Regions:
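Long, low-complexity C-terminal extensions of enzymes
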Residues: 208-234
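Conserved short secondary-structure transition element at the edge of the structured enzyme core
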Residues: 168-208
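Helix-coil boundary/capping segments in enzymes
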Residues: 1-16, 27, 106-113, 173-174, ...
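Glycine-centered loop/turn motif at secondary-structure junctions
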Residues: 23, 81, 124-125, 200, ...
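Electropositive phosphate-/nucleotide-binding environments in soluble metabolic enzymes
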Residues: 9, 13, 138-142, 154-161, ...
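Catalytic alpha/beta core domains of metabolic enzymes, predominantly
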Residues: 48-51, 63-176
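Active-site beta->alpha loop and helix N-cap motifs at the rims of alpha/beta catalytic domains
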Residues: 1-66, 211, 231
């Protein structure tokens, strides 16, 4: 899935065509956060893009930053041939249930949060998890998300629940280091990158205007990860 987010429909189309040309199967598009402030504008944004491309499109609902893709708008958009998925970043259960009731039989819906994934699979019937950092919960040879997903799909809910509970310390660190900053209005890219490096994945340097972590904060994050006992810290 290629992220093709842009304020300009022409740029989205260009990005989508490039993604398709290099082998991507789907793209995901965030609703514009500048000009699109009502349902009709959002609909026309996606309608125009879909008329110009031939690749599957996933809607991305982030009501904290953009005009919400509510159940009625999602129903309209689901009729466009390209629209095949919906990524839900609204934390409201009522909103998620409304989306599932509206379009759950037409397109695939994902709640963009790992914490309720086991419940989403087993109770809501959701088929996929689209999230930006489940990789922070795994390392080489240890894939707990895959393991508890496989266990649930194989009908072993006891084992799935056991594995899912085992990574609760990481969820708590995620709430502190990632969502804590995110919910306060700052993108926690530096923290994501350093977390990756500590568990053996190259994160690289941040680019302006993202501010790097201080050495003090790095030591604190490293100490927090060590205390979980779940990783061999690099």
């Amino acid at each position: 899935i290629a992220g093709c987010h842009h304020q300009s429909v022409k740029q989205v189309v260009a990005l989508a065509m490039h993604a398709q040309s290099i082998g991507y199967d789907f793209i995901i598009i965030l609703t514009p956060y500048v000009a699109a402030r009502d349902d009709e504008t959002v609909f026309q944004f996606y309608e125009y893009i879909c008329s110009k491309i031939d690749i599957g499109v996933i809607l991305f609902n982030v009501p904290q930053n953009c005009h919400p893709i509510n159940a009625n708008l999602a129903k309209r958009l689901s009729k466009l041939d390209n629209i095949c998925g919906y990524k839900q970043a609204d934390g409201s259960p009522a909103s998620t249930h409304a989306i599932i009731d509206s379009v759950g039989d037409d397109i695939v819906v994902s709640v963009a949060d790992e914490a309720p994934w086991l419940t989403s699979m087993t109770q809501l019937g959701l088929q996929w998890l689209v999230n930006y950092n489940p990789h922070l919960y795994q390392s080489k040879g240890w894939l707990p998300l895959k393991d508890y997903t496989d266990a649930a799909l194989n009908g072993d809910l006891t084992e799935a629940t056991r594995i899912a509970k085992s990574i609760q310390p990481l969820r708590e660190l995620h709430a502190k280091w990632i969502m804590g900053y995110w919910n306060s209005g700052r993108m926690p890219i530096a923290e994501m990158k350093y977390w990756q490096e500590l568990i053996g994945m190259h994160g690289g340097e941040t680019r302006p205007p993202v501010i790097p972590m201080t050495e003090e904060k790095k030591r604190e994050l490293k100490s927090d990860l060590i205390k979980t006992g779940l990783f061999e810290i690099v």
